[in-house]
Structures are given as structure tokens and as C-alpha cells.
């Protein structure tokens, strides 16, 4: 794979790469790039997470030395799973099991736990230095990386440490690339801004889109919201299970949820069914989506790219229900091996049951 092919693979289906010029320069230097994705083991794994998981696969395929940070302490600070660290750790193992079922090559992925970082005094030295070089106002604004608003900094002081910890995660691992959803942008930009002051690498930030919830963006009262708050309002969320498809949902439930999802005829903007196709189904190269329909409605068709799918949908040549049913079939094909892995292990079945009974946000 040459440099142009690597850049195309790394940048496809991303919202932004900061910056592509820096990425190209690093690749041209022929250095072995180190990247990471960090995630909070905060509960049930929904299909929105498969977007960054697919990009993780792309980066590994492009030859980037990737690690994944199981951010257990971060989840505790963020009050996930009641702050129960043991339950959070189990949720981390569950998420790694999902990634393996999704086809992530775990032999090429280094797994790092927050415990590996926080036991090192040099890590906390970095946290203090990052905090020292960041204003209180900016630290509060960065709380959106936790799925919180700036005013929630008043909940407890540990919330203010969180952004400095995330920046330190990057510096401590001496990374070239930080992968995350667009909701992680403020942490990554903070890392880039502070890097020079601390004589650290200016990390390349790769941001994947957030999958809109099944309700779409058109049914929500979002007028006047800032972009971060708007995205937080419409995104698929495990705390709003009616808006989400979970990886353990039965095939019948997946189909039912998609049949009831927002997908107006010819409308692309904030359309969850189209987004699932763009970022998850067509996230892999060489995929075909088969639309099954009666001959009186045009007969079966095979769609070989997302661009083709979007075009015929806009032109009104594809009925929303036909698209929903085809999407359900293809999505279930993707979820099937994941469901089998999770359902075969009682500790994860019990975890899912426990979380479903106590979803708070």
C-alpha cells in the first residue's frame, strides 16, 4: 500500500483529520506511526461505536501501530455504571469482545488499561502540567468530551481533572495519532495546543462522525443549540435505548427498530438509516446491499456503493421501507458473529441484564 492509498484509507468516512498535511508528512518520513483510541466502558455497546471501530480496523490495515485505552478510571470519574470500578472493568472486557467479533485484529492491537497509567507517578506529573497550562474556563468547555455540559463541572472536582487526564493519556503514550468521535475534538485540540509548551508531539487528530439516533434530527427541539449540544441531543445514545440499536439486539428487534426509524422519502440530512449504510454497512470495501422487492415495484436490485444508494434514494427510486428492510438484513449479518460471542459467555449476558435494569444516562 503506497502513501496515497494509506491516506485514502485512513481519511475515508471521517469528519475531519487535523491535519492531512501532517499525516502525509509523517507517512513520507516512513516512520512507524503510533495511534490510539480511548473509550469509557460505560455500558452497552451500540452500533454507533462501530463507526470508530471500523476506522480502527482501517488504521491497523494502513500499518499504524494502534492501541486501545480502556478508560476505566475516566468512566468512574464520569459516574458511569454507578462509579463501580469492578463493573466498569467487566464492561471493558465486554467491549473488547465486541471488537473482536467485529473483526478487529486483536493480535495487532495493544490493549492498555487506565490502571497501567495511573499507577505511574510520571503520568500524574503530566496531568498537573497539562492543568497548569490550561485555563479553568477552557477546562470547563472541554467537558463535552464526557457527554456533559460545562456547568456540570460543579458536580464534583474530579470532573475538572478529566480533560487533563485525556490529554495526558496521549502524551504519556507518545502518540502520533488520536482517534475519536467528533465529541472528542476539544480534548484533541487541547492536546495539540499544549504540546509545544510541554515539548511533546503535536498529535494528529482523526474524528469520526457520531451516528444520529433512530429518531433522526428532525423530531427534536434543537433550535438555538450550539453544535456540540446539538450533536449530543440527536446522537444515538445507550441512555436513550429507544434511539439505539445495540449489538446484542435480536434480529427481530433490529428489524423492528429500523422499521420505526426516521427515514422520510428522499431526505438525506440526519437520516439514521442512510448513516448506518454509509458508515457501517459500506464501511467495509467491496460490500453489496441487496434490495428485495416485488417485480411490480421494480424487482430486486444490488447496490454496490453508498453513493449509488444515496442517489437513487434522493431520486425517489427506492422506497424507505425497502431500504429499511434491506438495511436490517445486512446489519444483522454484521451483528450475528458479535451476538454469538457475547451470548456464549455468561458474565457478559449477566452484565447486559444488570445494565438494562439500571440505565440512567
UniProtKB/Swiss-Prot annotation:
It is an enzyme of class 6 (ligase). ATP binds at residue 238. L-tyrosine binds at residues 36, 162, 166, 169, 184. Disulfide bonds: none annotated. It is found in: Cytoplasm. The keyword Nucleotide-binding applies. Belongs to the class-I aminoacyl-tRNA synthetase family. TyrS type 4 subfamily. Homodimer. Catalyzes the attachment of tyrosine to tRNA(Tyr) in a two-step reaction: tyrosine is first activated by ATP to form Tyr-AMP and then transferred to the acceptor end of tRNA(Tyr). This is Tyrosine--tRNA ligase. It comes from Sulfolobus acidocaldarius (strain ATCC 33909 / DSM 639 / JCM 8929 / NBRC 15157 / NCIMB 11770). The lineage of its organism: Archaea, Thermoproteota, Thermoprotei, Sulfolobales, Sulfolobaceae. The gene is tyrS.
